[in-house]
Amino acid sequence: MTDDLNGSARDCVSKPMNAGEVHLSINAGVASVVFDRPLSRNAMTWLMYEQLGSICRRLRVDHSVRVVIFQGAGGEAFVAGTDIEQFKAFNSGDDGVAYERTIDQGIGLIESLPMPTLAVISGWTIGGGLAIATACDFRIATPASRFGVPIARTLGNCLSMSNLARLSAAFGVQRVKRMLMLAELLGADEALACGYLQQVCEPAELNGAAATLCGRLALLAPVTQQVTKEALQRLLMRGLPDAEDLISQCYGSSDFHEGVDAFVAKRSPVWTGR
């Protein structure tokens, strides 16, 4: 029997047009979380981030759930970042600090779920979408999937320290430099080779592979899984230096506002270094 919990997620905030939704359903101990905004490659709106947080808080206390799957709707993207239109309202570096702090809290809710988590990826996994996937314990993807944070080409913003720590642990520092400083996108083969992906399989086999991995995880000791997750998270996040001054500098720059304006206008940005 499937428990469809979409209504509770929708009710947490009012829904503007094309704001997208995050759906939750639970079947036989497996929770499925779906990012549903396929016409925009599942780019996250503020509403979707709020719904995701509400869902994670609900799952955290649901002891019937053994595994959580995160997946994008439509087959073209997992999540293609945060909807850039929303950044037009940013006026200062403080807005960027508040945004990164909020995103960190949301990603932390995924990371701190007590049960194993799996990102099932088909297509673009960019920016905030890469952060969501990286917060999961395991990831499987299709061969055409792409991974990156091309903000040096698009927005001219930066990442939080905790987001950088997660990406560096998952990919290695040099690959993170390629993604951030060269705006490169990594393919599925490279993501598999460096250990970021558990498996690469054809689109028709993706859901079956996810079900198989969920079955393996559900048979194993949940306390061991939970304690291991928490211990690794403590190791990763211990003693991270503060970087809010860097975030404020970046989001408060003229280049950031130029990046947003250029993206919305569908033109190439003109960077000035200011």
Regions found by a protein language model. Give the residues of each.
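Conserved CoA-thioester-binding segment of acyl-CoA-metabolizing enzymes
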Residues: 2-71, 108
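Glycine- (often His-adjacent) and acidic-residue-rich active-site loop
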Residues: 64, 72-109, 155, 239
